[in-house]
Design a protein with these regions (language model features):
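Extracellular/surface-exposed low-complexity segments
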Residues: 1, 13, 321-322, 339-371
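Acidic Gly/Asp/Thr-rich repetitive segments characteristic of extracellular carbohydrate-active
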Residues: 1-32, 37
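Short, T/G/N/S-enriched strand-turn elements that build extracellular solenoid repeat scaffolds
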Residues: 16-23, 36-44, 60-69, 86-95, ...
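Beta-rich extracellular carbohydrate-active architectures
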Residues: 36, 54, 61, 76-82, ...
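All-beta strand scaffolds that present successive hydrophobic residues in beta-strands
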Residues: 48-51, 74-78, 97-104, 125-129, ...
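Long, polar low-complexity repeats
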Residues: 250, 268-269, 277-279, 285-287, ...
């Protein structure tokens, strides 16, 4: 049976410590604005904790919580949660199968390797209009999860730790949200990742990651915007990558209507792209393959070549536009290029190659050059 328990210091209200001692499954705690502390932490099962202030910062709880293995649902609403010392704000351990919702909350992290939300069990986690400040979210190797993030922010940048780390098996759906640091998936994961109309500092993906990205934006403060390796499959539309988009191992990408600073492919990676701009350079190495239609390749002086192929890489293209701005193209080793172009702002286009029979460009004038 649901009990509504009003917590505060006024007449007729239950004190915070009494409410914690008498907490039962099904309880709904209604907290008056104020500061609440529980240094010993608390195991939670099927409870709702809601702040009654005008904003989350009006009702602050300093403590740490763990989800009980008998819990089916926990809700935090309109609260500011602060970890006690160096602890996780919420821990969902192995053996748990639960639903956890944060709605209009602020979670403050420790700013170190201690993650704010630690998920090792089976869980659905919803972040709705929620801010995680100076903290991280980690789904560990044993996790079987579903993450839904809407109108929320995870604000933490570190060269050592991922801002959002996805291991294990599960699905993450990120809508209208912002992740300021790195979103990581790992070599032993199996993850479906959907990013819609959201900002991510950069993406570092491995294992079996299936990415759908629509109207995504990455940051400018990293050496790469997106790095995919392993057996990743990426489907990207109408997105912007201010730094490099890198593929390795057996990664595959479908790229449409997007804008990338540069492309770097190696090993057995492949890209199929249409209606896309490549601002600085496109590099294909080893056995990498590219298939392009209505793509514009620029040179901006940051690289020696605006288009670079070596090893046994392969590229074919249709309706291409070249704007090298003084940079030549390189087709070296056993690499092969076959394309037709609509336009080049420099004619003849300069191509440096090891074997002229490995280059076929129709529609524009081009010439072979030597080093």
């Amino acid at each position: 049976m649901t009990r509504f328990v009003k917590v505060g210091t006024g007449g007729g209200e239950t004190t915070w410590h009494r409410a914690m001692l008498d907490l039962r499954p099904g309880d709904v705690l209604l907290l008056e604005p104020g500061f609440y502390a529980l240094p010993q932490g608390k195991m939670l099962a099927d409870v709702t904790i809601k702040g009654l202030g005008a904003s989350p910062e009006d009702t602050r709880i300093t403590s740490f919580f763990q989800v009980d293995d008998a819990s089916s649902r926990i809700i935090f609403e309109n609260l500011c949660l602060i970890p006690y010392k160096d602890s996780n704000t919420l821990d969902i351990p192995e053996g748990v199968d639960s639903f956890v919702i944060f709605r209009n909350c602020v979670l403050r992290g420790t700013g170190n390797k201690t993650t704010t939300l630690a998920i090792s069990g089976k869980a659905t986690v919803e972040l709705i209009a929620t801010k995680i400040l100076n903290g991280t979210v980690s789904f560990f190797k044993t996790a079987d999860f579903r993450l839904e993030m809407a109108d929320s922010i995870i604000d933490y940048v570190s060269e050592e730790f991922g801002t959002l780390s996805l291991e294990g098996h599960g699905t993450a759906i990120i809508n209208n949200s912002k992740i300021t640091g790195t979103l990581n998936t790992f070599d032993y994961c199996n993850v479906e990742l959907d990013i819609h109309n959201s900002f991510v500092g950069n993406l570092n993906m491995g294992g079996k990651t299936w990415l759908n990205m629509y109207k995504g934006q990455t940051g400018q403060d990293n050496s790469y915007s997106l790095y995919a390796r392993g057996d990743c499959w990426l489907n990207i539309m109408d997105s912007v990558f201010p730094t490099s988009l890198c593929l390795a191992d057996r990664a595959r990408v479908l790229l449409h209507g997007s804008d990338a600073y540069s492309l770097q492919l190696k090993d057995d990676s492949q890209i199929t792209f249409t209606n896309t701009l490549v601002r600085a350079s496109a590099n294909f190495e080893d056995r990498a393959k590219g298939d392009a239609n209505r793509v514009t390749f620029y040179g901006n002086g940051d690289y020696q070549y605006f288009f670079y192929m070596i090893g046994k890489s392969r590229f074919k293209g249709r309706n291409l536009t070249f704007k090298p701005n003084g940079a030549p193209m390189l087709v070296g080793d056993e690499a092969k290029l076959a394309a037709n172009a609509l336009y080049s702002n420099e004619q003849p286009l300069e191509v440096e190659c090891a074997n002229k029979n490995n280059v076929s460009i129709l529609g524009i004038k081009w010439t072979l050059i030597k080093k």
